[in-house]
Amino acid sequence: MSDLGESPSSSPPAPPADTAPPPETPSENSALPPVDSSPPSPPADSSSTPPLSEPSTPPPDSQLPPLPSILPPLTDSPPPPSDSSPPVDSTPSPPPPTSNESPSPPEDSETPPAPPNESNDNNPPPSQDLQSPPPSSPSPNVGPTNPESPPLQSPPAPPASDPTNSPPASPLDPTNPPPIQPSGPATSPPANPNAPPSPFPTVPPKTPSSGPVVSPSLTSPSKGTPTPNQGNGDGGGGGGGYQGKTMVGMAVAGFAIMALIGVVFLVRRKKKRNIDSYNHSQYLPHPNFSVKSDGFLYGQDPGKGYSSGPNGSMYNNSQQQQSSMGNSYGTAGGGYPHHQMQSSGTPDSAILGSGQTHFSYEELAEITQGFARKNILGEGGFGCVYKGTLQDGKVVAVKQLKAGSGQGDREFKAEVEIISRVHHRHLVSLVGYCISDQHRLLIYEYVSNQTLEHHLHGKGLPVLEWSKRVRIAIGSAKGLAYLHEDCHPKIIHRDIKSANILLDDEYEAQVADFGLARLNDTTQTHVSTRVMGTFGYLAPEYASSGKLTDRSDVFSFGVVLLELVTGRKPVDQTQPLGEESLVEWARPLLLKAIETGDLSELIDTRLEKRYVEHEVFRMIETAAACVRHSGPKRPRMVQVVRALDCDGDSGDISNGIKIGQSTTYDSGQYNEDIMKFRKMAFGGDNSVESGLYSGNYSAKSSSDFSGNESETRPFNNRRF
C-alpha cells in the first residue's frame, strides 16, 4: 500500500518516461494477461507505471472535472473490475499512434487518463480510486491495483482506470460501433489480455477521432454486458435479429394484405356473377310460359264470346252489322309500355312519327264527338274503336280499352311496346296514345278501304280483281316478313287472317291486329297459357298444344292465300260434309293442280278466267307449301315473298318436298285437336264471336258462321 502511495507521488517526476512507456506497453502487455488474472502483480508494476502516465496527465488537469462527472452515472456496474483493465489496455496504445495520426486528439486522449491519475495522486487514499473504478466497472480494489497492473499491461492504465476506459471505449464505439458498444465496458478481459498488443494499438488511432464520445461506451457497461466478444456478437446479432424480424413481419403483413385483397376480389366477382345470372334468369321464359304472355294473352269473356284478338277484331253478335274496318283497328296498337310513358311523359316522336303523339282524354273525346256511337268502327271484347278527326283534319281510329279491365291494361302495355318498334308501309301505323286515370286509348292511322275479308266475302260487292289479289298477297307477305326477319327480337303475329289485312285506296295491304303479337326472344318456340286465334287459320300444332313459332304465322298466311285463289271462307258450313274446312278441301286439289296444271277446280269461278295462269299456279304452289302439317317443313315468310314477287323461277318454295309427300296429315286428328282447343279455351258451347265475317256477312244476314256451332259443326260431323 505504501508503494501505491508512492507511485502517485513519484508520478510527477516521470514525464520523460512518456516516450518509454509506449514501447514498454506492448512488451508488458504480452505479460499482462497473466498479471491481470492475478491482482498481486499489479502493485509491483504500479510503482513504475504512475510516473509514466502522470507526466502526460498533469497539464490537462482542467479536464479532470468533466470526466469524473461522466463517470458517476457509469458506476451502476462496479462488479466487473477486471473488465476495466482491457479498456485500460486499449488506452496505453492510443498515445503513440494518436500522436502520430492527429496531434491534438491523441493528446486529448492521453490527457484524460492523466487527470484521473492525478486525482489518484492528489488523493492518495484509494477511496477515490475506488470511486473511479466503479464507473469503469472495475472493483474498488482494482483502483489502486490498476496503476500497477496497467503499467504491466500499459503505462497509461491507471490514468485510464475509469475515465480512460470511457474515452477509449467510446472512441472504439464510434470507430467500430457494433463490436465496441456492447464491449465498451470491457467484458473482454480474458480475450483482450490474450491479444491486446496488436488489436489495441490499431484501435487507438480510431479512438482519437471519436474520443469525445464517452457515454455510449459507458452506457454499455451499465447494461452489464458480458465479454466484449459476446457483446460484439450480441450487438451484431441483435441488429441482425431485429432486421430479420422486421423483414419477416413485413413479409407476413404483405402476404396477409394480398390474401385479403384476393378474397375481396373473389367475393365481389362471385356476387357480380350471381347478380348477372339473376338479372338474366328473370327475363328467361318459363318452360311453359312466355316472357310477354301477360301482355298478349288474355282470358275471354264468355258473355262477349270469342275474340280473335285482345282488341277484339272479331265482334260479338250485337255488333256484327258493323263494318269490318272496326275489326282491323280493334287490335292494332303502339307506343311505349305504361310504366315508361308515365315516367317519361311522352315517347320519342322519332319512334311514333312526327307530330303530336300524346293526347289527353278530353282531346280524344272531342275528336270522336264524345265517343258517339255513330262513330264506332267496331267493338270487341276489350273495347270499342271510334273514328275521329284531329284538329289538322287527319282521320284516325281511336281504340278505347274498357275501364277497369286489368286485361285491357296488360294488353295496352304489350301493344304499345310492340307497335312502337314496328314501322313498315305494309303494317298499320301508330299515331299516338292516351293515358288518363283508368282510361287507356290508342290512336292509329285510319285505313279507308276496309279489309280483305270485306272485299272477298261481302255480298253485293264487285269481285276483287286478280291483279289486286296478287298485290294484296305480296304486300301482306312483306309486312309479315318484316315482323319475322327485321324486328329484333322477332314478332309473331299469331292472328293472321283476312279480317286483319287492311286495304288503302290503292289496295295496298297493311297488316293490323298486333294485340296477339308476341315478342320471340332468343328461343324458337313459346308455349302459351291459352291458345288464341281464329278457327280455320290455326296451325295444327298451335291449336293442339299452343306451341308457337313463326311457322304458325306461315300456316295462317297460307290459308289467306287459299282465300285469294278460291274466294272461299276458311270454314264454310254450306259446303258438303268433309269439305267445310278450306284447308282440308284444298289439300288434294292442290296436289292435283301442281301435278297436272289443272287450275279449274281451285280458282275462284267469279273471276271468269280473268287471271294470269302462271301467277295463279305460283300462288297455289306457295299456299300448298305454307299449309303443310309439319311446321319445320313450311317455308319462311322471306321465301314466301320471293315466291310471290318474282316473274321468273321462284326457287324451291317446297324445300325439296313435293306436295302431298310431307308428314301425313290426319284431318280427323286435326278436327279433334280443334275441339279440344275449344273446350280448353271456352269450356263448353259458349258462342264464338262471329264478327270474324262482319259487315254484310254477319251472323244475322247469313246463315254462314252464325255461331260457334257453325264453325265447329264440320269437325263434329267429321268425328262421326
UniProtKB/Swiss-Prot annotation:
GO terms for cellular component: plasma membrane. The active site is at D495. Its EC number is 2.7.11.1. The keyword Amino-acid biosynthesis does not apply. InterPro entries: Kinase-like_dom_sf (IPR011009), PERK1-13-like (IPR047117), Prot_kinase_dom (IPR000719), Protein_kinase_ATP_BS (IPR017441), Ser-Thr/Tyr_kinase_cat_dom (IPR001245), Ser/Thr_kinase_AS (IPR008271). Residues 268-720 are cytoplasmic. Residues 1-246 are extracellular. GO terms for biological process: developmental process. Glycans are attached at N117. Residues 371-624 form the Protein kinase domain. ATP binds at L377, G378, E379, G380, G381, F382, G383, C384, V385, K399. Residues 26-35, 311-330 have a biased composition (Low complexity). The modification Phosphoserine is found at S528. Keywords: ATP-binding, Cell membrane, Glycoprotein, Kinase, Membrane, Nucleotide-binding, Phosphoprotein, Serine/threonine-protein kinase, Transferase, Transmembrane, Transmembrane helix. PROSITE patterns: PROTEIN_KINASE_ATP (PS00107), PROTEIN_KINASE_DOM (PS50011), PROTEIN_KINASE_ST (PS00108). Belongs to the protein kinase superfamily. Ser/Thr protein kinase family. Regulates the auxin-related MAX (More Axillary Growth) pathway during the shoot branching. This is Proline-rich receptor-like protein kinase PERK12. It comes from Arabidopsis thaliana (Mouse-ear cress).
